[in-house]
A protein has these predicted regions:
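An amphipathic, aromatic/His-enriched active-site/gating alpha helix that lines ligand/cofactor pockets
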Residues: 26-39, 56-93
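Catalytic "initiation/cleavage/transfer" segments centered on a nucleophilic residue
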Residues: 83-114
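Short beta-strand micro-motifs enriched in acidic
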Residues: 44-46
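Active-site-flanking beta-strand signature of metal-NTP-handling nucleotidyl enzymes
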Residues: 3-11, 52
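Short, charged/polar surface micro-motifs in flexible loops or helix N-caps
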Residues: 14, 49-51, 58-63
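Short, low-complexity N-terminal intrinsically disordered segments enriched in polar/charged residues
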Residues: 1, 22, 112-113
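Short, surface-exposed ligand-recognition loops at beta-strand->loop->(often short) alpha-helix junctions
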Residues: 11-22
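Residue-level preference for beta-strand/loop junctions
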Residues: 2-4, 35, 49
């Protein structure tokens, strides 16, 4: 079984960015509880101001199952309310991996800033 990434591109409603970021940790934890195959999550902001959510799943099947049932998780459904426009959801299989740093930081070391 190969791990897979889920890539979700979107824009955020005007004025919702701070709330979206503040609510994300609880939303991701709720997803982790609902879908044990969730291994890691990164939220990235693109140069054009849009966002790309990058989720690492144990398997593509677990990613696809979660995508079908994500709206059953109340925290996720509420968090999606911050999304102005979806630019698509994609699942991609990891073909090769080179893991040099097992973690980029704990929850207490989350990246913050501009």
């Amino acid at each position: 079984m190969k791990p897979a990434f889920e890539l979700a591109a979107f824009t955020v409603r005007d004025g919702d960015e701070a709330a979206m970021l503040a609510e994300r940790p609880a939303m991701i934890e709720a997803l982790r509880q609902a879908f044990p195959g969730l291994l890691a999550a990164w939220l990235t902001k693109r140069d054009d101001g849009s966002w790309l959510d990058v989720i690492l799943w144990r398997t593509r099947a677990e990613a696809e199952t979660a995508a079908r049932h994500v709206s059953d998780v109340p925290e996720a459904k509420a968090w999606f309310g911050h999304i102005a426009e979806s630019h698509g959801l994609q699942h991609v299989d990891v073909a090769d991996q080179q893991l040099f740093i097992p973690t980029l930081g704990s929850a207490s070391e989350q990246v913050t800033g501009p």
